[in-house]
Amino acid sequence: MNPIVKSFEYGQHTVTLETGVIARQADAAVLASMGDTTVLVTVVGKKVADLSRDFFPLTVNYQEKTYAAGKIPGGFFKREGRPSEDETLIARLIDRPIRPLFPNGFKNEVQVIITVVSVDPQIEPDIISMIGTSAALAISGIPFSGPLGAARVGYINGEYLLNPTVDQLATSSLNLVVAGTKAAVLMVESEAKALAEEIMLGAVTYGHDQQQVVVDAIAEFKAEAGKPTWDWTAPVQDQALVAKIKELAEAGMTDAYQIEVKQDRYVQVGVVKAAAKAALVAENPDVDTREVDNLLGSLEKNVVRSRIIAGKPRIDGREPDMIRALNVLAGVLPRTHGSSLFTRGETQALVTCTLGTERDAQKIDSIMGERTNRFMLHYNFPPYSVGETGMVGSPKRREIGHGKLAWRGMNAVMPTAEEFPYSIRVVSEITESNGSSSMASVCGTSLALMDAGVPIKTSVAGIAMGLVKEGDDFVVLSDILGDEDHLGDMDFKVAGTRDGITALQMDIKIEGITKEIMDIALQQAYGARVHILNVMDQAIGTHRGDISAHAPRITTIKINPEKIRDVIGKGGAVIRALTEETGTTIELDDDGTVKIASSNGEATKEAIRRIEEITAEVEVGRVYNGKVIRIVDFGAFINILPGKDGLVHISQISDERVANVSDHLEMNQDVKVKVMEVDRQGRVRLSIKEAQEKVAAE
C-alpha cells in the first residue's frame, strides 16, 4: 500500500485527503477528514455508456454510520435502515453542484457513495463530504470539470466566519453553504435571520473566495494521485440533421410558445415535434429517433432563450420582472387549525397548519446528537399537480428538499416555546405546478400559520428567479415558469420578510455568473417579494388573536416539584386516570411545570382541579369534605384529599359520649372534618365536632 496524503489548513480546521489504502477496487476512493470528522468517498463509473438513456445517470448516496459517533442503532434489528431526512438533504447538497460539471452527452453511469465513518460533534460532515467527493471525482479519470470547492459561512457580530462549529452556528444569524469551481459559484444553500441582500451576497462572495484553497489543494492532489482521463469524446451532432429539424420545426415551435396556458402549449409543442419526427422518419427510416428527440429539445430551448434575449415577451406574455396573477385565501378548510390557498399563475399550494403538544414534537437522534424539532413542514407533490399519473407514497428526495427549503424560509420568524408552547406541523399540498412550488409553499405556510393564531414575527414570502445568458447579454427573470427553470441557466430562490432574507437557494448551470448578475437578481427578488407580501397582507396581515376552537388549548400551572410523583402515581396510575377520565393531555417537567392540553375548556378545568387536589397541602384549621375509608375501635380514618388521610379520634366524633364508632359513622359516608393538627411525621388529626361548630358559627 502506498498512501498519498494531502493536508491543508481550512478555516479553524485541518483538512486531510488520503487515497491508496482503502477501497482500492473503486475507480477512486478518498478518505477525507476535517478535524475528527472523517468520510470515505468512493466513485465508480461504468466504462460503457447506456445510449438508451436521455439523461446522465448519476447517483449520489450519502450514509451516516452510527458507529461514527460511538452509538448502536435503535430498533429491533440494531442496524442502519433507510436514509434519514438529514442524509437525503446532504446527498442532494452534494449532487447539485457536481452534476453540471460532467460534460454534455456523457451517459456513462456514475455512482458516488459517501460514508461517514467518524464524527466530531462540533464539525458537521456535509462540507468535508463535498470536498471529499470533489477530490474523488478529480482523481477518478472520469470526465469532470472540477475541482469543486465548498465552504460554510456564518455571520456573527457583523463579521463572516468560515466553517463555524456547531456551537458557533447556534449564535450565528446565517448558515450558508456555497460550492463552486475556481471561476464560478455553482450552488448556494442558506438559512438566515432576515439579513440584508448585500450581507447575503457578501457571504456568497466570501465563501467562494475562501474555498479557493480547497480547489488548489485538490488540483495538487490530482496531479499526484490522479488516474489517466477516460478516452471519451462528446458525440458529434449531425449538422445536416440539425438544419433539417430547424427547417421542419422552428416556426411551429415559435408559434407554440405564444400559447400562454401550459397544458395547451405542451399539446401544441408535442404536435410540432411529432410532425417533424414523422417527416424525418418518412424521408429516412433509419434515422436515429433518440438523436431526433434530443435535437428537438435543443431547438425548443433555443427558441425560448432567443426570444427572451431579444427582449420579446416571455412564454406567458410577461415582461422579465413581472409576477403572475396572485390569488390568496386564508381559512379555507373548516376543521383544520389553520389553512390557506395560495395561487400564483398556474402554481397553487393548499397549506394546512396543525397544533399539537410538546409530546407531538419530532425527536431526532442523529450522529450529531439528539434534538427536538417543534416546527415541522412537509411538502407533497402529487402527480395530478402537473396533469400526470404516477406513484403516490413515501416522499421523494425532491419533496424532502423542497420542504426543507420552505422550512428554512419560515424558521427565522417562528415563536419560541416560551412564547407559544405548541408543536406545529405544516403540510403543503401542491395542487397545481408550473414553477416555484417551494416558494408558493413559503407564502402559503405564512398565511396558514397566521390563520392558526401562531404568533410569527412577520409575514414571509418567497420568489424564484431565473436567468438566460448568451455571451455578455443576459436577462434576469422574476417568478419563473417550469419551462424557464428547465431551459434557463440559473434557479435562484429567495424567501424573506420586508426586512431581509430568511432563505436563499441557488443552482447555476453555467460559468460566468458574476457578482453583478447575482446582485441584480437579489434586488429584483426584493421588489417581487414586497409585492407578494402586500397582496398576502390583504388576506391576513397578522396572526389571529386566538387559536382555532378545534385546536388543543395548552394551560400551564406550577406545582411543588416534590409533588410530581404524587401526580404521576405508582406505575403512572394517577396521571393515566387523569388523562383518560378528563380527556386531556398532561405533560410534567422536572421544575414543576404542568401543561394541560385540551380543546374542551371544561375538561381542562376539571384536570386542573384534580391536580390541585392531588398536590394540595393540608391546612390546619380548615374544614374539608371527607369520606370515611376505615373504621377502628378508637375512631375512623377519613380521606380529605387525594392521597391524604387523617384520623378522627372517637372523642372528636360528637359532643356526646361515643361508645361504638359504628353507631355514628359508616364506610364511604361523607362527613365534614376540621384539621386540628399535622404532626412532624405528617400524620393528620381531624375533628368532626369542631367542624360542626365552625360551620354553625359561619
Curated annotation (Swiss-Prot):
One of its GO terms (molecular function) is magnesium ion binding. Its EC number is 2.7.7.8. SMART domains: KH, S1. SUPFAM superfamilies: Eukaryotic type KH-domain (KH-domain type I), Nucleic acid-binding proteins, Polynucleotide phosphorylase/guanosine pentaphosphate synthase (PNPase/GPSI), domain 3, Ribonuclease PH domain 2-like, Ribosomal protein S5 domain 2-like. Mg(2+) binds at D485, D491. Residues 621-689 form the S1 motif domain. One of its GO terms (biological process) is RNA processing. It holds the Pfam family S1. PROSITE patterns: KH_TYPE_1, S1. Its cofactor is Mg(2+). The keyword Metal-binding applies. Residues 552-611 form the KH domain. Signal peptide: none annotated. It catalyses: RNA(n+1) + phosphate = RNA(n) + a ribonucleoside 5'-diphosphate. Keywords: Cytoplasm, Magnesium, Metal-binding, Nucleotidyltransferase, RNA-binding, Transferase. One of its GO terms (cellular component) is cytosol. It is found in: Cytoplasm. Belongs to the polyribonucleotide nucleotidyltransferase family. Component of the RNA degradosome, which is a multiprotein complex involved in RNA processing and mRNA degradation. Involved in mRNA degradation. Catalyzes the phosphorolysis of single-stranded polyribonucleotides processively in the 3'- to 5'-direction. This is Polyribonucleotide nucleotidyltransferase.
